[in-house]
């Protein structure tokens, strides 16, 4: 079979991008050429997956490489499933060539569909800070300053999280995260549950800020040079206060980068192929299952790139466990609403519901997160940030800087800390 050398990887990546831009800009919705491109895109992604770099040296390189399967699914979505049509505007007029190429390029980099008719729901709004505060700086440059300050603060949080992992002695690492410890739930003692809780908290805090770094920096640069506007960059993640159910954890708090694409693929299976009734229980939970299967595949590819030999089963079960979690959650909510409908609408009832929900989500993540991350934590070496501030200033000073930074960001920039 035809095989491309590893040195041609930039050619593969650029060919994929140019092909999708060309098809979006020059072909109509449901064009035969779009469907004929699917085998070509499949061949390209196969080559990308089987010919990764020999060494994945840092977090950003790992993130780019692990997103290869998602990029493929996203391209299939915008070309064939959602089938974006850039050759017609709302008035049936053919837009200019430059506008179509620009829109095609943006759709590739905009998996949340921000500013389009396909924008996913529950994306956080642009902060009110930009409307309330006025001064000698324009809205654009206030946005740039705020984003850069948040970038530095979040970078420091990620640096602290990575350093806590790097500085752990190998003997202690093996004792805490050794093979099989992620599955020790029933017989786990208080110390093991404490480790599970701390590992989950540190991981989710680090990951939450890590996924935001490129968004903060990219938005600051592009808006600073005038290529984009403030309102094209809603926050990547929502408020932790909304994460009182498992559905809200993914649908409101976490980033929505995968939602449009994976939902389009799952709807294709359930509605077009199986022709299940919309909003039926079977369609709903089968959609959930398909989305999480795709998500598991994407993240397992990331663990493969990281060189984790035992990192396949855990991440897969972690994502699939949420389907069972949704079933339990929906059943309990239905029973609660049926028995205590009037009482649950009071402010006290809502507070109790959300407090109980937060405890439920925290417990679920404490149980399941180690399935995903313990294989990673067992590694002696990990990806490094380009520059470690913790190595320069020390852990205690870094933690103090995070605390002071949080106060400044909250009071000066009205940031959602």
UniProtKB/Swiss-Prot annotation:
Q: Where in the cell is it found?
A: Membrane
Source organism phylogeny = Eukaryota, Fungi, Dikarya, Ascomycota, Pezizomycotina
Give the enzyme class. transferase
Which segments cross the bilayer? 308-328, 357-377, 389-409
Q: Which residues are glycosylated?
A: 64
The identity of this protein, by name, is Acetyltransferase cdmC
Q: Keywords on this record? A: Acyltransferase, Glycoprotein, Membrane, Transferase, Transmembrane, Transmembrane helix
Q: What is its main location?
A: membrane
* Uses in industry and biotechnology: Compounds in the chrodrimanin family such as chrodrimanin A or verruculide A exhibit strong inhibitory activities against protein tyrosine phosphatase 1B (PTP1B) and therefore, they could potentially be developed into drugs for the treatment of type 2 diabetes or obesity. Furthermore, chrodrimanin B, the end product of the pathway involving chrodrimanin A or verruculide A, does not exhibit the PTP1B inhibitory activity, while it functions as a potent blocker of insect GABA-gated chloride channels.
Please give, as recorded in its UniProt entry, the membrane topology of this protein. Answer: Multi-pass membrane protein
GO BP, one annotated term: terpenoid biosynthetic process
């Amino acid at each position: 079979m035809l095989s491309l050398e590893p040195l041609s990887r930039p050619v593969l990546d650029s060919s994929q991008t140019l092909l999708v831009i060309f098809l979006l800009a020059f072909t109509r919705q449901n064009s035969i050429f779009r469907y004929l491109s699917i085998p070509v895109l499949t061949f390209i992604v196969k080559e990308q997956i089987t010919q990764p770099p020999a060494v994945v040296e840092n977090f950003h390189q790992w993130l780019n490489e692990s997103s290869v399967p998602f990029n493929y699914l996203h391209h299939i979505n915008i070309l064939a499933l959602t089938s974006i049509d850039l050759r017609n505007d709302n008035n049936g007029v053919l837009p200019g060539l430059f506008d179509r190429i620009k829109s095609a390029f943006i759709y590739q980099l905009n998996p949340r569909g921000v500013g389009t008719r396909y924008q996913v729901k529950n994306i956080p709004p642009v902060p009110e800070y930009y409307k309330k505060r006025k001064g000698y700086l324009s809205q654009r440059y206030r946005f740039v300053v705020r984003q850069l300050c948040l970038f530095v603060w979040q970078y420091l949080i990620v640096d602290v999280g990575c350093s806590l992992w790097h500085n752990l002695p190998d003997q202690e690492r093996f004792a805490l995260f050794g093979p099989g410890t992620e599955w020790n739930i029933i017989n786990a003692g208080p110390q093991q549950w404490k480790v599970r809780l701390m590992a989950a908290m540190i991981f989710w805090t680090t990951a939450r800020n890590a996924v935001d770094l490129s968004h903060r920096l990219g938005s600051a640069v592009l808006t600073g040079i005038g290529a984009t506007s403030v309102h094209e960059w809603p926050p990547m993640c929502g408020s932790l206060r909304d994460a009182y159910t498992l559905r809200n954890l993914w649908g409101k708090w976490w980033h929505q980068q995968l939602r449009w694409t994976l939902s389009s693929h799952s709807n294709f299976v359930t509605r077009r192929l199986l022709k299940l009734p919309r909003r039926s229980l079977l369609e709903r939970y089968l959609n959930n299952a398909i989305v999480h299967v795709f998500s598991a595949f994407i993240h397992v590819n990331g663990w493969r790139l990281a060189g984790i030999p035992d990192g396949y089963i855990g991440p897969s079960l972690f994502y699939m466990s949420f389907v069972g979690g949704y079933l339990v959650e929906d059943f309990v909510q239905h029973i609660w609403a049926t028995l205590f409908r009037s009482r649950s609408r009071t402010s006290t009832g809502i507070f109790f519901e959300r407090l109980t929900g937060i405890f439920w989500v925290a417990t679920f993540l404490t149980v399941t997160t180690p399935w995903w991350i313990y294989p990673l934590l067992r590694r002696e070496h990990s990806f490094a940030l380009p520059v470690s501030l913790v190595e320069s200033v020390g852990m205690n000073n870094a933690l103090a800087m995070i605390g002071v930074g949080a106060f400044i960001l909250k009071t000066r920039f009205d940031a959602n800390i």
